[in-house]
């Protein structure tokens, strides 16, 4: 099973808006070198909402190619139409992903019954392991632990990314879903506590720019060493808030560009590049986290 420190990878782009595959390859190598445990390709942070399906699949496939079996790649397969999610899932099943991460259908606000039917239909279209993804701040639907529990019996649904920031859900999910069901935090600010309470891993935005420290924090928390985890986490806490001073992934792409990790900080409309009033805040947080800016 995939656990530990997982990066919600940005999708680097050229100034004309095309995907920058050279920078993508460098990012994959960077995370392998820094010890990241797995990569999520084309999730929310990877701008899945603005990549058409053919491009989405290509970016995931290239990420798998660059990884070359050295690090697991999880492909984002979320959509707010079940038929579209199934089509995407079938395509991703052919490119070598280790698992897929499917966000709850957004905007159309399905009921719990609809969520269960959606995920069962998507899971039935593939043998690849599926990870549920609950992020109500973006989707306008909250998949409660009781709904997640209805999907545990589906053999290839292996876990959930829980991004509400409500760490009390760890205990409830464990009670309802059992010890073999994988629980991933999707909230950097509460990730350490999530792991200490029994979570298995973190799918992180900040991990894009502080992978070595984030990996060390995750390892400490998974080992039950709360004091060490807190000491590693403390210098990073400013990042956890300032990386959301504007909509993700605007700030993290700007930061990655300032670090020289990507050639260009371009982001696709309707998102725009980081506003100047956030530059100082983010630079200050990066300095505190001991990030070198070029």
Swiss-Prot record:
It catalyses: L-aspartate 4-semialdehyde + pyruvate = (2S,4S)-4-hydroxy-2,3,4,5-tetrahydrodipicolinate + H2O + H(+). PROSITE patterns: DHDPS_1 (PS00665), DHDPS_2 (PS00666). One of its GO terms (cellular component) is cytosol. GO terms for molecular function: 4-hydroxy-tetrahydrodipicolinate synthase activity. Pyruvate binds at residues 45, 203. Keywords: Amino-acid biosynthesis, Cytoplasm, Diaminopimelate biosynthesis, Lyase, Lysine biosynthesis, Schiff base. One of its GO terms (biological process) is lysine biosynthetic process via diaminopimelate. Coiled coil: none annotated. InterPro entries: Aldolase_TIM (IPR013785), DapA (IPR005263), DapA-like (IPR002220), Schiff_base-form_aldolases_AS (IPR020625), Schiff_base-form_aldolases_CS (IPR020624). Transmembrane segments: none annotated. Its EC number is 4.3.3.7. The keyword Lyase applies. Pathway: Amino-acid biosynthesis; L-lysine biosynthesis via DAP pathway; (S)-tetrahydrodipicolinate from L-aspartate: step 3/4. The keyword Lyase applies. It is found in: Cytoplasm. The active site is at 133 (proton donor/acceptor), 161 (schiff-base intermediate with substrate). The record marks 44, 107 as: Part of a proton relay during catalysis. Gene3D superfamilies: Aldolase class I. Catalyzes the condensation of (S)-aspartate-beta-semialdehyde [(S)-ASA] and pyruvate to 4-hydroxy-tetrahydrodipicolinate (HTPA). Belongs to the DapA family. HAMAP family: DapA. Homotetramer; dimer of dimers. This is 4-hydroxy-tetrahydrodipicolinate synthase. The gene is dapA.
